[in-house]
């Protein structure tokens, strides 16, 4: 073993999700996910959920399932409330989003703050 968990103390990293985030949308997602799957959600689960909400909204705005119309609708969605925040794409179709800062303490990820870009 080169280094133990204590070697990470005081280090920080960013993520899009932490179960420690007190945001009511995040906490509702966690509650619903645990009720359905009987396990804690991970980052991939919350991203899949957010993406599904965005596509569902685009289908609604497109008035159907035509792929071209859905793509156009996705690019026009602004500030759609999803579990991790607000969903918007920039002019190059990249998501505009924030994240969270996590600090490592004694081998445990500790939520520090939410950031918005």
Language-model-detected regions and their locations in the chain:
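Extracytosolic ligand-binding ectodomains
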Residues: 1-117
């Amino acid at each position: 073993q080169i280094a133990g968990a204590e070697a990470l103390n005081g280090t920080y990293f960013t993520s899009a999700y932490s179960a420690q985030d007190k945001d009511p949308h995040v906490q509702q997602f966690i509650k619903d996910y645990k009720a359905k799957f009987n396990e804690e959600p991970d980052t991939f689960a919350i991203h899949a959920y957010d993406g599904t909400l965005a596509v569902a909204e685009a289908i609604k705005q497109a008035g159907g399932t035509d792929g071209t119309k859905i793509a156009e609708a996705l690019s026009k969605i602004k500030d759609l409330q999803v579990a991790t925040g607000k969903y918007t794409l920039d002019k190059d179709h990249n998501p505009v989003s924030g994240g969270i800062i996590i600090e490592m303490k004694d081998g445990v990820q500790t939520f520090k703050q939410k950031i918005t870009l």
